């Protein structure tokens, strides 16, 4: 993969910037959109990468959704306790992988998909809205009354209104239902106690309110949590982001504030992602906001911002919002020498031949 290398002078400038950064967390996304296809299972394959991940100074690894899902990638889950039906591997392999990470002092982050859920059976209307928990005590055996009342055609009108954005491909779960709250919190605690996960990445977190997210974070007490709140930036007539993205980053700040700013909750800094995509194309002036600070969430609340260059949605084979491929190392030079918790993407680290360059930047950041 073609890549534009940093000049020595730019690297030295960035080295100077990094001097003010204290050692801290570095997140690693340990999969891409195609990882489920790997022969022999992704969990087993990733086991062979643990030493390299740990040696790079990475502190947390974000793993793919672990539950049974009608979509191979895991983002359409149904039987939440069933970890043996995952395309990435089985429950025993997952526990072995997490054990290997823990053995190197690296924490494991689960991809939590709770905005929506796929049903096993149809009700009397012929609608798939009867959920199977595969537990001996009927936990997660839900019906249409556990679906948001405004989520047609799945709902039967007895649930509470949705507290966030609609997800059209599957029933939106009613997170104001007390039984739903209780049983999902129990499942999260099971993922911690029995499987070994340390924290959560909340998928499609804009699908339910920050108050709802707070319930699950408070009841499961993860050491780290990060939310995906992906909304559109403000764009000008030239099709590029406006210089002022205060409204966009304020939404991220508000979410963390409502969940509890003193707790473990963070959000992916999509504001910085969008601005950086354009800035590296010869418009570095965009990296200074209207207030003279960094223009993303890291300019306002860096301790709660997780920066990234690409992920399984924006990059990989989906290419929903890809970073310029020939300037990826410029992106890493920025996020690894600026405040916030940087997230390194598997593809860039292992598949694009950028491991050594990223390693060096992480070493600069952590003082290793």
Swiss-Prot record:
Keywords: Calcium, Carbohydrate metabolism, Germination, Glycosidase, Hydrolase, Metal-binding, Signal. Monomer. The record marks 313 as: Transition state stabilizer. This is Alpha-amylase type B isozyme. Ca(2+) 1 binds at residues 115, 162, 165, 172, 207. CDD domains: AmyAc_arch_bac_plant_AmyA. Belongs to the glycosyl hydrolase 13 family. GO terms for molecular function: alpha-amylase activity; metal ion binding. Its EC number is 3.2.1.1. Substrate binds at residues 75-76, 201-206, 230, 232, 250, 257, 293, 299-301, 312, 318.
